[in-house]
Amino acid sequence: MNELLNEVTLIARAAGEAIMEVYRGHIEVERKEDDSPLTVADLAANHVIQSNLKRLTPDVPIISEESASIDYSIRSGWRRYWLVDPLDGTREFIKRNDEFTVNIALIEDGRPVLGVVYAPALGLMYSASAETGAIKQQGTTAPQIIRARPLHAGQPVVAGSRSHSNEKMDAFLQQVAEKLGPPKLLSLGSSLKICLVAEGEADVYPRLGPTSEWDTAAAQAVLECAGGCIVDVQGQPLRYNTKDSLLNPEFFACGVAPPAWQHYLT
């Protein structure tokens, strides 16, 4: 698995290079059927990732945000597959705030067992497997093992979306303020929010709105290998490819030994 993880980090870097070529120039935006944005960078990164994964593991199927949908009657029989978001945070990419990522995860029996999250504009790589643990590398500095943290006395730190906020999130923050004290809010784009929890910079990332499975899988692998977890609002672990829809339930990305964050919902 360690060798496989190394190969996937190289693929993520290559996809990041394709994205940055577009990022440095004029960005043209199309709209998908659900009105979400699509750029040439999404498609270029998708091509790099899919072609390289097929070379690396020709017998392992791939689900990608930018590929044709695969009926559940087919994928329900998959024990092992790749789950990819070639460019997570397209809105951040369009805004040019650098907070977008390449997400690649290997799913086995409904769980992400290997994950790579690469933010090419930031030179920031997160990678994880059971054998290696969770690793962060900034630029060319030495990789370091990261660990999520338990909630401790003092100001709670909550990671939140830079592009997606709603009344549920506002109500959650109010409950946290009343029970634990006013939280510090860290706003960030893409799956980097989950990685903040994985490296112990935040206590929780509540996602109280829609996401797709490719948005979370790679970062969930990083978080779980760092000692944290992602649970839905019933406290159950987030699982993959269990139904026709590829939408996630609302969830909490949590640190070590977390409180029942769902009790902070009104």
Where on the chain are the PLM-derived regions?
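Glycine-rich active-site/cofactor-binding loop and its immediate structural neighborhood
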Residues: 78-120
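Conserved beta-strand termini and adjacent loop/short-helix elements that scaffold enzyme active sites
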Residues: 32, 65, 188, 207, ...
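Oxyanion/phosphate-interacting regions
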Residues: 1-10, 171-178, 194-266
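Generic detector of well-ordered alpha-helical packing
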Residues: 43, 66, 86-89, 120, ...
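Acidic beta-strand-loop-alpha-helix segment within the catalytic core
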Residues: 104-195, 242-266
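Residue-level signal for inorganic ion chemistry
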Residues: 19, 42, 53, 90, ...
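N-terminal subdomain of lithium-sensitive/metallo-dependent phosphomonoesterases centered on the IMPase/IPPase/PAP
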Residues: 1-87, 171-174, 236
